[in-house]
Amino acid sequence: MNKYLTWVEVNLAAIRHNVRVLRKLAPPSAGLAGKTKILTVIKADAYGHGMIPVAKVLVKEKVDFLGLSNLTEGITLRKAGIKTPILLFETTLAEQAKDIIDYRLTPTVCTHELAAALNHYAQKRKCVVDIHVKVDTGMGRLGVWHEEALGFIKKLSRLRNLRIQGICTHFPSADTDRAFTQKQIQQLSTLVGQLKRSDSNILYVHAANSMGLVGYKAQILNLARPGLMLYGLYPRPGLEKKVNLRPAMSVHSKIIFLKRIEKGRSISYGRTFVARRPMTVATLPIGYSDGYLR
């Protein structure tokens, strides 16, 4: 017997199905063999689905990268035995450089201080550390402004124990502002062209979240970062008619109380529901404290 009156069930088979669908959606790659590579986003405990069990499914599906927010998440997966390459989306502090190297994580870099610290510890370990450089093309948060990115990358390329494996940006409004998103892609494309002319050997260029993957086909992008769609959620209405995803999470609850109410009685906060006829009302033990908006 389930001791919980309200619970969540996660269907790992649905996640397996969804990642296979996402692979088929990925366009031909730019400069890589086969299709665009897939980085599955499992930050924030895999959006509440359970980071470790979801990661194990994705490892069996041979995804190219796992995407996490921070160092703590990365260490958790490594201690769970996950060996797939892990990209940390958040830039970290220089004081965390040693742990990044010790746990074989790939950091996102947008400060000289972090780059120098990584290079220092990599020299001590006699290894080369892969990094990705975050370029700000309009999100306005993390990242080097795209106008300054070429100079920043050139300086980092002089650090012998770092390898700039990828550059990335982020779309703030891919589902609502196509013109702005296309402008971001163009800015990133300009940077890629500049890097090629300077003989830079960067393997991955990435920006596409779920909406970016299905809504934009940019030749320069060769690594996609789907999040929502991995869990069976659609980034825009109507997409479910074209893409067959399966929801991975379901919420269940048991009725704990039944009551008859007459016409005109109101129910719960704000009295937003008023009975138009006599009816039976069921109460479920789930609410505001569980994240279910009243």
Residue ranges of predicted features:
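Anionic-ligand-binding alpha/beta catalytic cores of soluble enzymes and soluble regulatory domains
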Residues: 178-277
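A short, Lys/Arg-enriched amphipathic alpha-helix followed by its capping loop at the start of a domain
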Residues: 21-28, 60-61
